[in-house]
Amino acid sequence: MSILNVIRSHHDVEPQNVEEEPPLTGQTIVTEDKLETSAKDKKHESPSMSEDEEGSVENVDAWDLTKALMSIDPNHPAHPHKWPLWKKLFVATVYTFLEVYVIWSSTACINFFDIYQTNWHCSIQVSYLVQSLFIVGNAFGPMLLGPMSDIFGRKWVYVGSLILYIIFQIPQALAYNLPMMAINSAIAGAFGSSALANVASSMCDIFTPETVGFGISLFVWGANAGASIGSPIGEALYDHWRWFYWMNMIVGGFFVILCVLCPETLPVINIMNYSSTTGEKTVQVSTLAKAKSAVVRTKFVLSTAFKLLCTEPIIMALGLYNGFAYGLIFLYLDGLFPVFVDNYKMGYMGANLTYLNFLVGVTIVVMLQPIQNWLYRWDKRRHGGVARPEARFLISLLTVWFFPAGLFWFAFTSDGRISWVSPLIAGGVLGVGDPQLWLAMINYITDSYPSVAGSAIAAFTLPSFAIAAVLVHLGIIMFDNMTTTWAMATLAFISLSLVATIYVIYFFGHLIRKHSRLAVTQQALQEAHDAKVLPEV
């Protein structure tokens, strides 16, 4: 039984002529005469896809596109999984450092807030809108860019959004009031968000399920590295702060060239190009070729991520969890200056350099990935060769405790009476716990929604960044009205409640996936494995 038939059979879709299905030969699995829409989907029924219907779009809608995307065979010779290692590493490296470049703006700007207050006569809360609206842009941008990359391809979404990101650096560099700065920061954040949703998707495109943990760890490393080095960069350019945005334009131009040089990673685009050369006919190629209508594609792009967020309990739960976790990190970062400048009498550059403990922490997370990958393969063997998405959390069952532990450690050793080294190391512990959780969640989502990963990650990102944007402003109130010790301790107590979520997903995630329309169920994975559709370890 093919993977499409397996998936469809668990979403009220009956396969046709299964007994007569030809053996796998390395080609795309599903042929046109094997697709029949169930009564549940009769409103857009298309039992056959003849060449006469090639130009028609009446029978193709956003759900048809989603099903076609989910039917891609990972063993197809044109699939990026078959690329040589050097090609995969080149693409992964370019996109990882693209993410570093975009994310550093989220923390670099905090050094300029007192300049905004002095020049534009605003309060500190208002000046923080530049940061929080950039994060809001990061939240909503993927809701459009993620689904666009799932249907039009990753490469040109990167290039187009990056060019627009560069353009909106100009009004920030020339800003003459705070509204101009904040609004353009939000727009730039939206276009730059392709480095969030789409980089993770690209890693899933090129790496197999057994090695994708490494690719996603690079994605997580890029996000945390960018946030870590952004603040020192901003401090270094403090006296010439407008040059930060001119520098962003120069560096961005370099990345545009690299993105143009990178090959397309979306499997369906590669397979369609292969099919146009060889004349191969498959269901997914026919469906996607028919979907030339701008209306159909626009419906897919605009509806898919929101549909996933509103109807998929996995994405909703993990998105809300990560929103609080990500927000707690911004609250923690709000506390670094009161701790290291006020309590330890460091200079501002010294305090900014303490952000680098997160860079050390996330580098340790990358180094832990061989252990997590071994545990993942061990769990797969233990379950008869069937991979469980929940196995992505195995190492996180331990490291999740680093989150509250790091916050408690920081809280009660940061009052200035104990060496500054202690809270610095505590921040490093937090820098291991938080990125490892994010890594596990991204892996889990991409395993559960493999061929609409861009849309799934976009849906996951929205609540994550929206909540974080609100908590940025809450941090100012907390540290103005509480001591640094009890402000940090409050964050630590809140983080304890988040630990349970990881255990719930690990032990009960397979039950949640059973009630999903798009997530791959464990039974579907088992049947696909039995049919030898999925690659062996």
UniProtKB/Swiss-Prot annotation:
Membrane-protein topology: Multi-pass membrane protein
Subcellular location per the Swiss-Prot or TrEMBL entry: Endoplasmic reticulum; Golgi apparatus; Membrane
CDD domains: MFS_Tpo1_MDR_like
Keyword Membrane belongs to the record: yes
Highest taxon above the source species: Eukaryota
Region (Disordered): 10-56
GO MF annotation terms: pyridoxal transmembrane transporter activity; pyridoxamine transmembrane transporter activity; pyridoxine transmembrane transporter activity; transmembrane transporter activity
Entry similarity comment: Belongs to the major facilitator superfamily. CAR1 family.
Biased composition (Basic and acidic residues): 31-46
Protein name stated in the entry: Uncharacterized transporter C965.13
UniProt keyword terms in alphabetical order: Endoplasmic reticulum, Golgi apparatus, Membrane, Transmembrane, Transmembrane helix, Transport
GO biological process, one term: pyridoxamine transmembrane transport
Coiled-coil ranges from the UniProt annotation: none
Keyword Transmembrane carried by entry: yes
Gene Ontology cellular-component terms listed: cell division site; cell tip; endoplasmic reticulum; Golgi apparatus; plasma membrane
Bilayer-spanning residue ranges: 90-110, 133-153, 156-176, 180-200, 213-233, 243-263, 313-333, 348-368, 393-413, 422-442, 457-477, 492-512
